[in-house]
Amino acid sequence: MGRFFNVNIEFNRDKVNEIIFSAILNKRKGYICSIESNNLSIANINPEYNRIINGSLVNICDGSVLAKILAWIHQQNFDSYIGADLFLSFIELRTFKQYFLGNTQEILDSLRENLAKIDPAIETMRFCPLPFADVENFDYLAIAQDINANQPDIVWVSLGAPKQEIFMHKLLPYLEQGVMFGFGAIFNFNACVGSVKRAPKWMLRWRLEWLYRAYEEPRKNIPRYVRFLCLLPRLVWQEYQTLRQQRRLTP
């Protein structure tokens, strides 16, 4: 896992899966972050949040534009590993005991129904909504006690960035086992109810999901994109400086 724009990211999908499987099989606990323009920007503004992001087991690149920018800088074949795709790949394995945490009861009920069509065992797995609260005000001990009682291999967390990454970091000390994934809107995408939906397939093929997100939730996403674009020149310059230093040190 390399450090790009001051954040740890693993671009090798096989390596990502290897880290996750190893943690699950060895009953390790930890969390996985999905890096895109929003949480990358926050990680470059907030040092504590940066520490949380870089304290994960592994981070994936959930932004196709971000992957292209870094591929251009480093002249390597970097590609994104979209959280929604990783989520479905693990559901389709029909192997692990899972726990679904966060979002609303309506979303969770529909999510259970849809995922159970892929893996019938999911019908009896735990789906737990969370109240709307500041990340400092959750009862982490009580949440962890319910998770520990179920002993899941995987805990999917749907709170949205940056809240979900901070939440996972705070919950981690109370867990006995389980790999947490903070993947935001994947519950909404797969529940197929509510206002938040995944982009049409043609937009996914052309790596335009970011544009669909801006159209779908402009008040939320356009300011995030603007913040990232304002930070981008400095990040690119710093990345080039780091790359030059590495090349000078390489025999």
How would you describe each model-predicted region?
Residues 67-68, 198-251:
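A transmembrane-helix-recognition feature enriched in membrane-embedded lipid enzymes
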Residues 29, 96, 175-179:
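A short helix->loop->beta-strand "cap" motif at the edges of active sites that frequently abuts
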Residues 1-79, 84-85:
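N-terminal nucleotide/polyanion-binding subdomain common to many enzyme families
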Residues 112, 165-174:
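Short Gly/Thr/Asp-enriched flexible loops that form oxyanion-binding sites at enzyme active sites
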Residues 67-146, 150-151:
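Conserved beta-alpha
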Residues 37-40, 159-164, 185-186:
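Short glycine-rich anion-binding loops that position phosphate/pyrophosphate groups of nucleotides
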Residues 130-135, 176-214:
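Short, flexible loop segments at boundaries between secondary-structure elements
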Residues 147, 151-161, 177:
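Proline-aspartate-enriched helix->loop->beta-strand connector
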